[in-house]
Amino acid sequence: MQQLQNIIETAFERRAEITPANADTVTREAVNQVIALLDSGALRVAEKIDGQWVTHQWLKKAVLLSFRINDNQVIEGAESRYFDKVPMKFADYDEARFQKEGFRVVPPAAVRQGAFIARNTVLMPSYVNIGAYVDEGTMVDTWATVGSCAQIGKNVHLSGGVGIGGVLEPLQANPTIIEDNCFIGARSEIVEGVIVEEGSVISMGVYIGQSTKIYDRETGEVHYGRVPAGSVVVSGNLPSKDGKYSLYCAVIVKKVDAKTRGKVGINELLRTID
């Protein structure tokens, strides 16, 4: 694996010179191998190690290099044709392979090659970009988008129209991460490498980026870029220092544990916020 990483790192340093016409065989094979490993879930752009999320930047570099070495090509679709550098993940799947890998794909869901989809996942008409990782038992609901390199945990529900931000550039940026057993409400947007920690519930229409204040009303604490585990979050506002205006924020209205989540439905958690 170190040799593969070295090839990617070296090629990335001269990425501006690489084109589909002049890409050498070693670089091309290394990039294609990484994309295949991401596609199968053998590698992932980010993973939790000793309780901390670690981003493997060299894998992001491989994804970016794939756009340098590949030319646009015609891609066949059910209702139309497309013209892009990245083929679709399921282009060569037959019924036996779908059965073996054990997930459902409802038309016209679109998944790019290089994204991993785990068993018992359901993809409603949605979009999953290259480098993303969608773990077991997750529902990606209608018109939800999982951005490039985003990491989605086990038993997550991404409701209708949810946007999970992608991140390929700038290179140092970390991917957006939704940990296990989270619920993201309809039309919410989680972007810019924000981490939603395990067991959290995000209400409908909540927008969280790195600069969004995440206000805990019980403690008065303000978080940035991270929703603490077990949080129930709704949209809100905080007043300015002079009291003349207010600005948008996300509000943690309560904390719940796994036991409470098991006894109480998502709707009840969101309705009883007073």
Swiss-Prot record:
Entry EC number(s): 2.3.1.117
Locations listed in the record: Cytoplasm
Family recorded in the similarity comment: Belongs to the transferase hexapeptide repeat family.
Cytoplasm keyword on record: yes
Higher taxonomy: Bacteria, Pseudomonadati, Pseudomonadota, Gammaproteobacteria, Enterobacterales
Transmembrane regions: none
HAMAP family found in the cross-reference section: DapD (MF_00811)
NCBIfam families: dapD, PRK11830.1
Keywords, comma-separated and alphabetical: Acyltransferase, Amino-acid biosynthesis, Cytoplasm, Diaminopimelate biosynthesis, Lysine biosynthesis, Repeat, Transferase
PANTHER family in the record: 2,3,4,5-TETRAHYDROPYRIDINE-2,6-DICARBOXYLATE N-SUCCINYLTRANSFERASE, MOLYBDENUM COFACTOR GUANYLYLTRANSFERASE
Any one cellular-component term (Gene Ontology): cytoplasm
Chief subcellular location: cytoplasm
Biological process annotations from GO: diaminopimelate biosynthetic process; lysine biosynthetic process via diaminopimelate
Native species: Escherichia fergusonii (strain ATCC 35469 / DSM 13698 / CCUG 18766 / IAM 14443 / JCM 21226 / LMG 7866 / NBRC 102419 / NCTC 12128 / CDC 0568-73)
PROSITE patterns in the cross-refs: HEXAPEP_TRANSFERASES (PS00101)
Protein name: 2,3,4,5-tetrahydropyridine-2,6-dicarboxylate N-succinyltransferase
Gene Ontology molecular functions: 2,3,4,5-tetrahydropyridine-2,6-dicarboxylate N-succinyltransferase activity; nucleotidyltransferase activity
Enzyme superclass (EC): transferase
InterPro entries: DapD_Trfase_Hexpep_rpt_fam (IPR005664), Hexapep (IPR001451), Hexapep_transf_CS (IPR018357), THP_succinylTrfase_dom1 (IPR023180), THP_succinylTrfase_N_sf (IPR037133), Trimer_LpxA-like_sf (IPR011004)
The keyword Ligase is annotated on this UniProt entry: no
Catalytic reaction(s) noted: (S)-2,3,4,5-tetrahydrodipicolinate + succinyl-CoA + H2O = (S)-2-succinylamino-6-oxoheptanedioate + CoA
Gene that specifies this protein: dapD
Annotated pathway: Amino-acid biosynthesis; L-lysine biosynthesis via DAP pathway; LL-2,6-diaminopimelate from (S)-tetrahydrodipicolinate (succinylase route): step 1/3
